Amino acid sequence: MLDAAELLHFRLPAVTADTLVVCVSQSGRSAETVRVADALAGRHSRPTVVAITNGADNPLAALADIHLDTRAGEEHGPSTMTFAATLVMLEAVATALGASSTDGAEAAALAAERLVTDAEATADSLASWLDDRPVLTLLARGGARAAAEMGALTLKEAARFPAESLQAAQFRHGPLELAGPEMAAIMFSTSAATRTLDVGMAAELQAAGARVLVIGDDDVLGSGGAGFALGRLSDCLSPAVAVIPTQLLAWSLARARGLDPGGYTRATKVTERE
């Protein structure tokens, strides 16, 4: 996975005719993503470009060799619907390329429904868990990093809260000094391969006095403290469910601050310039 602007300005020469480039843009109009597709389309020997967007009438879809429409519908503010819908499309792409089909969409949908059964009460309990702590770090490994990145972005966009997303192993290389009573941490742990490491980090942060929330499959909650059990979900779709508690937290914080969680004051829904 590469940031489109980094690919455009620094790594585009590494893309060859044998490369499959999957461009993701909610609007299909994001400046740097469209410029990547345009630059590749102008090559004599061009790679195959797949575009994933919400809707078909956009420049990115027009430039792509293959276009996948998430059909998420009209969306205002943070990309909550399109984030989940994009993960469904990415799993479809992976399956088409030969990955094992998990047929996990129904399980993910049911898990998401459970999390929002009493959305307002859950949102308020998450705000109480944070309890005015000024430091909130979202930690994850592997595919769960998508949930951590999106969660931190939503907290910034919707609640103007300066949450930070970090790869869990990188967190030990210095940022661990943040651990203490003023810190809150959300650990996303959806992979059995790193569960022991995730649980150990969560316990270490708790021992340092931090408030810790663990989001993962049923086994990970044995680490103690607060948490959300998601059940067994596919690796690709689990971030769409795991991110929901952070969305609810952002909504509660925005409401408490008198903000519109679906509105912007400086950013825009569609970013058409770098």
Model-predicted regions and their roles:
Residues 66-184, 194, 257-274:
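Active-site phosphate/pyrophosphate-binding segments
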